[in-house]
Structure formats: structure tokens, C-alpha cells
Regions:
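Active-site helix of classical SDR
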Residues: 136, 173, 181
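Short, small/polar-rich loop/turn modules that mediate ligand/substrate recognition or access, typified
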Residues: 189, 194, 266-268
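Canonical Rossmann dinucleotide-binding motif of NAD(H)/NADP(H)-dependent dehydrogenases/reductases
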Residues: 17-47
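Alpha-helical segment proximal to the catalytic Tyr-Lys
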Residues: 141, 186-187, 264
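Substrate-binding pocket helix/loop in short-chain dehydrogenase/reductase
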Residues: 111-113, 117-125, 236
């Protein structure tokens, strides 16, 4: 009985998101799936959002079978109405929203600026920067009314460097997200609202494959081969210093810390998780 009581006590102690409601975008795979899974295991009620209907519903079903209180919503983050619906779904289902994880992202396949057409630029920024801004815009009033809340954005080391982690559009979008993170943190700290970002390096996800399918633009195929060869060679020099990719679960643990009360005085921070890649 004593052993059982200790286990129950220990379980309660590690439920860092008990009684919290979290909304995770890009939850069908990769970092988003790992974050949603970990948050649910830590006691949160989780709304999983993704454009991949089959994928997000499968992840949700898997978590429900394990006794987690979760639901899914299929959205296109480039549509403002879908973002509004996503937030309202969380409120309707669980009565509150405590944590917003802006994780949906798209990669630009390292296309340099001279070969970036408007379609590629606008697509990448709409998903990587405009969508998080809109989600935050809809969430802030809810957080203010509730007396606080937490936002965690999935940035990238590309938001802290010039070309190491992506092409022109991707780098610009992630720099913008880093700036947005700091802006939100400073402007709304008096309402007990925290906004931070995790900046991963290389992670073992399917973002490249998903991005190839999503990018309907000539840029991905129209980059001058000579330019691309030079750029790829330079980027590969950085890869050589840090060849191990992170597992999505490693990034999820960083997001968990930032979302939890353990990070109560962490606000406006960009937490790099890149295995020392940018330390070189």
C-alpha cells in the first residue's frame, strides 16, 4: 500500500500540465505530434490541429485509447477563418485555453533569394509567420480574460542565423517569428502572458517531404544549378560539425518546460535546441 501510494504521489508530482488545456498546430507528425503526445501524458487536455486529416485523427485516436482527453480539428492555417475555428473549438470543448503551441511550419528547400518567386515567399511566410500571428491575435483576449496563458512558438536556428538553416523565405519567416515572440512577451507580460520560442536545429521529421508536396511554385525547381551547388556545399560545411539530428521527443521536452509553470519567469526567450550546431 505504501508503494502504491508513493507511485500515485509521484505520478501527481510529474503531471506538469494537469488541469491545463493546450492547442497544438501541426500535430499530425514530427515535433507537433511529439509535443501533443507529451502534453497529454503530462495531464493536459489537448486540441490537435493539422491540415492532414488522416494523420491528425490517427494521432488523436491513439491518445484517446491511452485515456488521454484530446480531440482533433482539421485546419488550413493559411485561412484566418480556420484559425478562429481552431481556437473556438478548444474553448467550446474544454471551457478554457491555457497553452498555445504554434508549431505548423513549411520549409523552402534552401532556395536563395534571387530564385525565390513571390508564390514561394508568400506561401512560406503565410504558414510560418502570418498563421502564428493570427493564432496569437485570437488567443490574447482569452488569456487576458482568464488571467494569463502561455504561447510557445516553434522557431528555428534559421531565425538566429543567415543561411545555415534554410533559404531566403524560410530564414526571413523564422527571424520574423523570433521578433514576434519577443514583441508579444513584452507587450502582454502585465497580463501574466508568457511567450517564448524553441529554436531547433536539425530534427528527424518529415518537414522536407511535406513541404515538397505543399509548395506549388516554380522556385523549388527553378533555382540555378550552379548557385544551388555552391549554396548546398556551404550549408553542408555546417552540417559536418553536427551530424546528429534531434528526435522530435527531445524538442517536445523543451516545449514542455516553456509551457509549464516551471518556466514562470521565462518570457521573451528563444531557447536553442540544436546540439551545439550554432555554437560553432
Amino acid at each position: 500500500n505504501k508503494e502504491k501510494g508513493f507511485l500515485i504521489f509521484t505520478k501527481k508530482m510529474i503531471m506538469r500540465l494537469k488541469d491545463k488545456t493546450a492547442l497544438v498546430t501541426g500535430a499530425a507528425s514530427g515535433n507537433g505530434r511529439a509535443i501533443a503526445t507529451l502534453f497529454a501524458q503530462e495531464g493536459a487536455k489537448v486540441v490537435l490541429a493539422d491540415i492532414n486529416k488522416e494523420g491528425v485523427e490517427q494521432v488523436t485516436a491513439d491518445l484517446q485509447q491511452k485515456g488521454c482527453e484530446v480531440l482533433s480539428v482539421v485546419i488550413d492555417v493559411t485561412k484566418e477563418s480556420d484559425i478562429e475555428q481552431m481556437v473556438s473549438t478548444a474553448i467550446s470543448a474544454f471551457g478554457r485555453l491555457d497553452i498555445l503551441i504554434n508549431n505548423t511550419g513549411i520549409f523552402d528547400m534552401l532556395v536563395p533569394v534571387a530564385d525565390t518567386d513571390d508564390a514561394l515567399w508568400e506561401k512560406v511566410l503565410s504558414i510560418n509567420l502570418t498563421a502564428p500571428m493570427r493564432a496569437i491575435r485570437y488567443t490574447i483576449p482569452i488569456f487576458k480574460e482568464q488571467g494569463g496563458g502561455v504561447i510557445v512558438n516553434t522557431a528555428s536556428i534559421a531565425g538566429l542565423t543567415g543561411a545555415r538553416g534554410g533559404g531566403a523565405a524560410y530564414v526571413a519567416s523564422k527571424h520574423g517569428l523570433v521578433g514576434l515572440t519577443k514583441h508579444v512577451a513584452f507587450c502582454y507580460k502585465e497580463w501574466n502572458i508568457r511567450c517564448n520560442a524553441v529554436a531547433p536545429g536539425r530534427v528527424d521529421t518529415n518537414i522536407r517531404d511535406n513541404s515538397k508536396k505543399a509548395l506549388q511554385t516554380s522556385s523549388k525547381d527553378g533555382c540555378l544549378s550552379e548557385d544551388m551547388a555552391k549554396i548546398t556545399e556551404k550549408i553542408a560545411m555546417g552540417y559536418a560539425t553536427n551530424q546528429r539530428k534531434a528526435a522530435p521527443e527531445e524538442i517536445a521536452k523543451v516545449a514542455l518546460f516553456l509551457a509549464s509553470d516551471e518556466a514562470s519567469f521565462v518570457n521573451g526567450s528563444i531557447l536553442v535546441a540544436d546540439g551545439a550546431w550554432t555554437a560553432y
